[in-house]
């Protein structure tokens, strides 16, 4: 096999800038070393396969948003010549062109790369993250098939893939590299009953309330359906547990398990100090107080109405854009009935009619949409802060319908 230098250079280039600085010396040495190393050529038979060890590596979560669910890699270790590499399908860079819009639209490309095992462990040790190795009990023929697939994967034209959080990520790629090239079927334990994509990620983002809230807002109806065993393996810990209990060709798939790095105790930061629920209750309380003033005085404040429409419309733009996103489980989202871009279409009309205290059909339209959104919660989980804000907006719509004068009634029109 040929772990070519081009792949390794690409790997170094694609790492975030701080990691590049930390690994710069390591990669220079590695590239020089690999210039004289040749593994087994693609056109020649693979030999000494019995001395090769294939392992699944599972890494514990980190502090960054993209690391909160852990990571998976594959280890290739040739005990005869000492070659020891980690095959990593989770390489990306936030510095690439148009990264943010591409990420929002689900058009982010990830890369597959190879690095020395010592460098891989050094990085995770620096981040205080744990690494567990599961050595696979597979035949020589299985190893040959995996190595052939790896030779194909590592070609420069094959290293890039379109990332999909639930269906095609670093964990599913590592699994497929192994399982899809075994000569016998892997028998996994029974799938988790009633496990949905949303419920599974809640186990990992629960300590980060704003991350959990943001993801719950963006995930739609399809995130709440029951998942299959294969779908449940998008999470590194799930795949590790399944491998541990899997049967292959009459024996355990995993021959032995080793803790290569013990995770360090990390201080978890939940981001913004005020939890989403408290923030929602605070904003809803302000809106309720203003609505009470509206009702008692039978007079609305166009500035507050404008503020609500602009904020909800801006949030609605995000949900509207997600309709066209390639991200899984985001295109069909009932929350768009609560927050959508329609307020911008009615903004000028609302300002004019609120200043004249006239009836505005927008409040009826919005009230109907919000009501339909609450009906949609039967099919989709909606986080409590979003429901609180939606209920607050519904009350605001009702107050307007109660106090606004019909357009035909004007001061001095009666004779």
PLM-predicted stretches and their roles:
Residues 50-129:
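Glycine-rich catalytic cores of cysteine/serine-nucleophile enzymes that process amide/ester linkages
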Residues 28-37:
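Bacterial N-terminal signal peptides
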Residues 152-348, 352-362, 366-412:
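Activation targets extended, charge/polar-rich intrinsically disordered C-terminal tails
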Residues 41-45:
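Boundary at the C-terminal end of the N-terminal hydrophobic targeting segment
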Residues 93-168, 172-182:
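A cross-kingdom signal targeting lumenal/periplasmic-facing segments of multi-pass membrane
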Residues 3-8, 18-29:
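Bacterial N-terminal signal peptides that target proteins for export
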